[in-house]
Amino acid sequence: MRQPAVAGQFYPLRPDNLEKELKQCFEGLEIRERNILGAVCPHAGYVYSGRVAAHVYAVLPKADTYVLFGPNHTGYGSPVSVSTDTWKTPLGIIEVDRELAEGLTGSIVDVDEIGHRYEHSIEVQLPFLQYRFDQDFRILPICLGMQDEETVIEVGTLIANLVSKSGKKVAFIASSDFTHYQPANLARETDNEIIEAILNLDVPGIYERLYRRNASVCGYGPISAMLTASKKLGATRAELLNYSNSGEVSGDMNAVVGYAAIIVE
């Protein structure tokens, strides 16, 4: 079983405190399911980015399976890995969609638990899903250490084909923060350029702007894999629901991390 790695750090360890914090994240937001295929959510501590993430989860539809693409911050494990372990959070147990996972056999995606063991980017999304949908769903966690354009397009296409054949209702979630440790005005300027490419569903444009701006968006690969898969399944538009940065909470606008909530329909 994949035990929580960052409970008590990124979000509360005790279930009652975690539910209280999640409730605060959703405060004032209308819970209204939209026909969403994909989304971008931040993965910082809930005190910093939980409110931004809640903008996505408030409108996320109920699905059989949520495919979660996250960057590999730790460097452990395979370059592209899927976990087939059961995942545990303070709110309970989540099963992996082993049928979809088995479809990845022999592909660029390795079954590998090591890459997931200490990685926070996917884990921090799970209590949001549990808060909204209880335990009535499965996940497919994909951790991307390799984030080059060719790899993520291959992964996104592969997942989309599997989902299409399965007939299941699936939503894709890309876990990513945006610019790291720049003054707020510069971070927003860089992030606006990357977000514009995302809203245009333009994967090559994301990479072009990323290199040109030397941007420190940590989950550009997961975002691009999510966009690739969503487009394969018919997505035609994207929308920015919310943008913020860590300075809004800490008060330090000289070195912020950017957070965006984006949906793809």
From Swiss-Prot:
Tell me the InterPro entries matching this sequence: MEMO1_fam
Q: What's the superkingdom here?
A: Archaea
Pfam name, any one = Memo
Q: List the SUPFAM superfamilies hit by this protein, alphabetically.
A: LigB-like
Q: Which family does it belong to?
A: Belongs to the MEMO1 family.
- NCBIfam families named among the record's database cross-references: AmmeMemoSam_B, PRK00782.1
The entry's protein name is: MEMO1 family protein Mbar_A1422
Which species is this UniProt entry from?
Methanosarcina barkeri (strain Fusaro / DSM 804)
The uppermost taxa in this organism's lineage are: Archaea, Methanobacteriati, Methanobacteriota, Stenosarchaea group, Methanomicrobia
